[in-house]
Amino acid sequence: MSVDMNSQGSDSNEEDYDPNCEEEEEEEEDPGDIEDYYVGVASDVEQQGADAFDPEEYQFTCLTYKESEGALHEHMTSLASVLKVSHSVAKLILVNFHWQVSEILDRYRSNSAQLLVEARVQPNPSKHVPTAHPPHHCAVCMQFVRKENLLSLACQHQFCRSCWEQHCSVLVKDGVGVGISCMAQDCPLRTPEDFVFPLLPNEELRDKYRRYLFRDYVESHFQLQLCPGADCPMVIRVQEPRARRVQCNRCSEVFCFKCRQMYHAPTDCATIRKWLTKCADDSETANYISAHTKDCPKCNICIEKNGGCNHMQCSKCKHDFCWMCLGDWKTHGSEYYECSRYKENPDIVNQSQQAQAREALKKYLFYFERWENHNKSLQLEAQTYERIHEKIQERVMNNLGTWIDWQYLQNAAKLLAKCRYTLQYTYPYAYYMESGPRKKLFEYQQAQLEAEIENLSWKVERADSYDRGDLENQMHIAEQRRRTLLKDFHDT
């Protein structure tokens, strides 16, 4: 939260929010079980302790390159021994079936020949087309070569060593690992690594090939993910692959295990991809909403937002208002935190295509503006965190307490960032959500979370005006709101 460039804020009006307050224009709905749930949510926040169930709890392990390689090697040697195949072929089979050994063994017992066909290490007898070229003839360079210089996979499509070398070298230079396949048209067979390595002309290419193979092995493994951090060699291992938050213990990168993108709960992986693509396509929208200034709705003075809190106070007239909707903050909380909920036009389906297009744009802008606003608030609150850190250092240096005495201030700023990050990703979720009782429940929880986050942000930015107990109580409420929303809606 902030005001004009020279202003400081004062205490907020922190009123309780009435979940049953609805706009008069909206149709009256039978609340049914939802109203009971609203009451339950409010009581849950007060009853749950700090050790309450965390819906984001997720067990994972960070592995080094050597540890990952060792785990992969163990799977490979075990499978090769059971199936009586080479280590290279065993790896191709494992890649094709995402390293799920039990499934591979079941398929092998059921139909071993079909397993090898599906893994692309043996040709399909019903579809295999043998070479039509004369003996000792390379089908690529069209040259006659000595028999010992002709090489082929299990498909028996023969090509000269020189053509194989060029084929493999070009693909490795292009970043291909496991994906190197037979040169014959429409032949799906993949080349085992023990076939490729002797064909690479120098150690530099062989080193690249090893890296690409390792990358492909990890990416195909259902329990492993490469850390997306810059130049980070770590691998994350889990027991159950899900769209959950993981953090590398080497570079501290935080990401979604399932899609390796920025963590995005409660929005699922497919939805966040759609949303980010849409935002990128509508780049002009970002320019339209990029302004950091708005006019005070009471005295019209230009106000700059240089803090994360959306509770604004004009330095000139002391009017308290919401940055997002410009509504009076005194009544803001009593109106179901309305500015977080989009009011759709129920008659839009009966209107013209142009009207529907305008409504679609209006809806998108509503959600995008809030998404972008919370992103900016996170950046501004990161600066607040640094100021708190510096202030604590100054107090400790002046013998005004120890780090332990003031640690709660940093904890509050960290929790604020955690809660606001979750809130930011509720907007893509709501944008794509179908209208109905479940969306109304989601919007209620979203509004409750947003209200408590703004209360926490206000207090963090004015920590000297609040005692420790008040701040920690607000932290507890905000975190429980966040956990309640994720428990009910982060189900991927």
UniProtKB/Swiss-Prot annotation:
The keyword Ubl conjugation applies. Residues 64-111 are annotated as: UBA-like. It catalyses: [E2 ubiquitin-conjugating enzyme]-S-ubiquitinyl-L-cysteine + [acceptor protein]-L-lysine = [E2 ubiquitin-conjugating enzyme]-L-cysteine + [acceptor protein]-N(6)-ubiquitinyl-L-lysine. The gene is Arih2. A zinc finger (RING-type) spans 138-187, 296-325. Zn(2+) 6 binds at residues 322, 325, 332, 339. Zn(2+) 4 binds at residues 256, 259, 264, 269. PANTHER family: RBR FAMILY RING FINGER AND IBR DOMAIN-CONTAINING. This is E3 ubiquitin-protein ligase ARIH2. CDD domains: BRcat_RBR_TRIAD1, Rcat_RBR_TRIAD1, RING-HC_RBR_TRIAD1. The modification Phosphoserine is found at residue 352. Autoinhibited by the ariadne domain, which masks the second RING-type zinc finger that contains the active site and inhibits the E3 activity. Inhibition is relieved upon binding to neddylated cullin-RING ubiquitin ligase complexes, which activate the E3 ligase activity of ARIH1.
